[in-house]
């Protein structure tokens, strides 16, 4: 399993853990190294262990963390392993009630009723969709996984999520040289109502590229 622990600037002030739900990934996003292979889905205990290990390895007292986030957004598509993810979140919510839990997903074509029901039951769970492009055509090239929601369908799921939980869902958009025009922004605004969705903007980090280099590219795009 791959898990990443972030510190901003001290663990007590803010701790973010990104953990995996699968070994490899069946989705095959073109920018992701994990998409080249898929081995298996993790059990709930294996997902929870990643969080426990990150905290214990750095001797972090989770109860003292002021801003604590646990995100399933490393290897794997979490909603293609939902039964085990649900069990893992139930355990994590019990062990770390001060942690915000986040599902980051490309939006596979599944039944979202159990997902939203879990988010109603566990009040710390957030939902983020990896949108990345302003049209389905461009997104299909970046994420060539057939069994996924369209952008319009993602928007509709987000509206249901807000209505049922009272919490805004997120969409993530990877900015690059070819999708940052005003026309792209207008398309995104038409699809994802700001009264419903929160937006996060990121940059695609190539497999052989450092995070620092990727950040430099994002700053260039934003300037």
What residues fall within each predicted segment?
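A short loop-to-beta-strand scaffold at the N-terminal edge of the catalytic core in hydrolase folds
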Residues: 2-6
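Canonical Radical SAM [4Fe-4S] cluster-binding loop centered on the CxxxCxxC motif
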Residues: 7-49, 53
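Generic structural motif recognizing short loop/turn segments at the entrances and edges of beta-strands
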Residues: 1, 13-15, 123
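Conserved AdoMet/S-adenosylmethionine-binding subsite of the radical SAM
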Residues: 56-69, 74-222
């Amino acid at each position: 399993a791959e898990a990443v622990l972030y510190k901003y600037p001290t663990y007590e002030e803010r701790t973010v853990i990104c953990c995996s739900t699968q070994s490899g990934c069946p989705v095959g996003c073109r920018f992701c190294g994990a998409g080249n292979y898929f081995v298996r889905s993790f059990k709930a205990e294996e997902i929870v262990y990643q969080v426990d290990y990150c905290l214990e390895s750095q001797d972090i007292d989770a109860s003292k963390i002021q801003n604590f986030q646990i995100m399933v957004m490393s290897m794997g598509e979490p909603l293609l392993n939902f039964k085990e993810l649900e069990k893992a979140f139930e355990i994590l919510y019990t062990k770390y009630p001060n942690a915000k839990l986040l599902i980051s997903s490309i939006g596979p074509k599944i039944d979202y009723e159990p997902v939203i029901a879990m988010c109603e039951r566990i009040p710390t769970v957030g939902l983020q969709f990896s949108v990345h492009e302003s049209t389905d055509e461009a997104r299909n090239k970046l994420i060539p996984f057939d069994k996924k929601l369209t952008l319009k369908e993602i928007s509709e799921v987000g509206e249901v999520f807000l209505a049922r939980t009272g919490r805004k869902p997120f969409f993530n958009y990877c900015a690059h040289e070819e999708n940052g025009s005003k026309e792209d922004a207008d398309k995104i605004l038409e699809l994802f109502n700001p009264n419903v969705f929160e937006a996060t903007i990121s940059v695609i980090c190539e497999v052989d590229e450092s995070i620092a280099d990727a950040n430099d590219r994002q700053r260039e795009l934003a300037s």
